[in-house]
């Protein structure tokens, strides 16, 4: 059943949303941005980690792990491994790849540990995903940072999936200039 995990201090809304989503028959997961989340409120938990990418992403891995554990408890992970893979890319992997290489090593190691033995750690499940999603997850499963060139390729391929070629080129240029969003 649906449980609000009070042990999760950061991202508890995401964990609860996925508890509901995984058990709903009429809800679809989309990666479109539905609202602009304001993270700049002084003293908020999000504000404290805003400029420390590694710490923030390691917290995101904890959020993902809580969702994964909840879905594993009721056997939902096996039926929705592709959704879990997409969510992982949106929540953790894309931003980890922005760190380009060795700086994302701890994050990728944490992701590999979280996925170990899960339904997402499965070639058959990844075959159900878009190739760019499967490639990002497979890179994370290795548990160490990809080379900077591969990071850029994985990001570009994922952007093509989400935004088309033109949108991906715009995001690539923004990433090269150090901007977060286009």
Predicted regions and their residues:
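Conserved nucleotide-sugar donor-binding catalytic segment
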Residues: 1-50
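Short charge-dense sequence patches
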Residues: 7-19, 60, 152-157, 171
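Short glycine/serine- and small hydrophobic-enriched flexible loop segments
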Residues: 22, 65-69, 94-98
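Residue-level recognition of short, structured coil/turn motifs
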Residues: 25, 75-76, 178
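Catalytic core of nucleotide-sugar-dependent glycosyltransferases
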Residues: 32-41, 47-76, 102-121
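All-alpha amphipathic helical-bundle segments outside canonical DNA-binding/catalytic cores
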Residues: 75-85
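Amphipathic alpha-helical repeat scaffolds of TPR domains
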Residues: 83-95
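Membrane-interface aromatic/basic loop that binds lipid-linked glycans or pyrophosphate carriers
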Residues: 101-182
């Amino acid at each position: 059943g649906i449980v609000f995990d009070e042990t999760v201090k950061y991202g508890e809304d995401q964990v609860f949303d996925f508890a509901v989503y995984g058990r709903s028959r009429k809800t679809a997961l989309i990666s479109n941005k539905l609202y602009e989340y304001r993270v700049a409120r002084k003293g908020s938990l999000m504000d404290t980690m805003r400029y420390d990418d590694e710490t923030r992403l390691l917290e995101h891995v904890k959020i993902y792990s809580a969702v994964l554990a909840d879905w594993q408890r009721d056997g939902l992970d096996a039926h929705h491994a592709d959704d879990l893979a997409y969510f992982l890319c949106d929540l953790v992997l894309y931003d980890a790849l922005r760190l380009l290489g060795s700086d994302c090593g701890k994050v990728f190691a944490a992701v590999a540990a979280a996925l170990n033995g899960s339904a997402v750690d499965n070639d058959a499940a990844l075959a159900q995903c878009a190739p760019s999603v499967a490639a990002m997850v497979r890179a994370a499963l290795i548990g160490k940072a990809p080379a900077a060139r591969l990071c850029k390729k994985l990001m570009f391929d994922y952007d093509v999936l989400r935004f088309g070629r033109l949108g991906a080129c715009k995001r690539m240029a923004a990433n090269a200039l150090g901007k977060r969003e286009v």
